[in-house]
Amino acid sequence: MAGHVHTGSAAVLLVGLSFRSAPVSLLEQVSTVDTDLPKLENALLDHDSLSEALVLSTCNRMEFYTVANAFHPGLDHIVDTIATYSGLDDSELEPHLYVHYSDAAVEHMLNVASGLDSMVLGEQQIIGQLRGAYEESKGAGTVGRTLHDLTQRALRTGKRVHSETEIDSAGSSMVSFALDRALTVLGIPEASSDALSGRRAVVIGAGAMASLASTHLGRLGIEHVTVANRTVDRAEQLASHAVEAGVPARGIGLDELPAALTGADIVVSATGAVGTVVSAADIKAAQQVRDGRQQVLIDLSMPRDIEQATADVPGVALLNIEELTGMTEDTIEDEDAARGIVAEELESFLEQQRAQAVVPTVKALRQQAMDALSNEMLALQRQTPGMSDEDREAVNRSMRRLVEKLLHTPTVQAKKLSAAGQSVSYPDALAALFNLPTGMTQQVSAVKGANAGSGQRKKQKPQENRVSTARAVYRSTYQDLTQASTPGGKDDDQ
């Protein structure tokens, strides 16, 4: 991919942690700062290295999107701010943080909005969460042009992915497939609205996948669902949703889980925690109470929640991510299609941003030309006091048209070159800016070489002057362009 997205010398800098990088306990501790996100976002802008800020906070991620004009100072300030607001030390945070800069940060937000980075592949809830984060940051006055454009592009990308693919059915398909397998293990011939009548289940976790499991169990006629989670409030919230859907349910903390396991015919775990949630010892104890009645354990987490050794306990069947690969072909096709859409939107956005980056330089060039024209008109007025106002205005209009014509092509070409993000040589860039015919500069050089010392030098002088003048204009313009579109200083070389 050609070029990087910078606004002047600034670029998007993202620092985050999610279910992929951090344990649930750490995520919960960091997420406590979202009680006053506007205050947090303004704290991020207390440092000169950052000019925009947006914080995306969900149950599975906490991401800090900023626009930084200096990479290292900006990164240090973000980490320090997270540590201050969460009450954690840098040493506790840093092993679990990920950092994306410039184009990579842009691509990450597009992936997030598309559900490609979610615990449940393709889930749509993240679109609303990102929109809410944007509105809150906008209200706090911490979002500028760059993050506005990026967020709107991400929301557009997410909508495209969900309307043009069926990736949002991937998570639901996995849960459905897992429960179909569970029915087979339990000797139930087919799925129906009363297939699990008289059976009880435990769902561990309170995120999107746990919610899907609870919903599917209800559709199969489960008698009762117990939702267990580290945070009891969230377990009770998910249980209340099940009750509203007509499924008897209750929420408990993980400390009550061992007792709940004894009554569960089906256990679905989807916490995303780091470390074992259900051990072989837990299941052995439960089976002693159950007198060996068949029990199906479904582990939908990565890394695993349920210890592999539980599969060796008599009367127990363990289904994990590896066991559920039979439904993946369609999902892979949808994921590939979704990533193709993200790639299209990413390239389009980068081109747009690169083109916008050259606008201030183009405006400065045009202003400089108009200032020079004004000075020349003042000089003309002093030199020709007898010229009528009508003639002077005619000259002024003519000169302005000339300046506009001279600047039109390099202005358009500069935007095209910037959008393309290609590296070109000085002669090629000069030819491109002024849209010179291919080979014209070589022809001029050949004529100059053939006439060297021939006595015809004076005849070529006007042509040489025009080329020299164009080169001088180009050098000045190119210097401004590169200063406007290249990261400034050693802190921006990441």
UniProtKB/Swiss-Prot annotation:
Coiled coil: none annotated. GO terms for molecular function: glutamyl-tRNA reductase activity; NADP binding. Substrate binds at T58, C59, N60, R61, S118, E123, Q124, Q125, Q129. Pathway: Porphyrin-containing compound metabolism; protoporphyrin-IX biosynthesis; 5-aminolevulinate from L-glutamyl-tRNA(Glu): step 1/2. Its EC number is 1.2.1.70. It comes from the Bacteria. Gene3D superfamilies: Glutamyl-tRNA reductase, N-terminal domain (3.30.460.30), NAD(P)-binding Rossmann-like Domain (3.40.50.720). The active site is at C59. It is an enzyme of class 1 (oxidoreductase). Possesses an unusual extended V-shaped dimeric structure with each monomer consisting of three distinct domains arranged along a curved 'spinal' alpha-helix. The N-terminal catalytic domain specifically recognizes the glutamate moiety of the substrate. The second domain is the NADPH-binding domain, and the third C-terminal domain is responsible for dimerization. Catalyzes the NADPH-dependent reduction of glutamyl-tRNA(Glu) to glutamate 1-semialdehyde (GSA). Homodimer. During catalysis, the active site Cys acts as a nucleophile attacking the alpha-carbonyl group of tRNA-bound glutamate with the formation of a thioester intermediate between enzyme and glutamate, and the concomitant release of tRNA(Glu). The thioester intermediate is finally reduced by direct hydride transfer from NADPH, to form the product GSA. This is Glutamyl-tRNA reductase. It comes from Corynebacterium urealyticum (strain ATCC 43042 / DSM 7109). The gene is hemA.
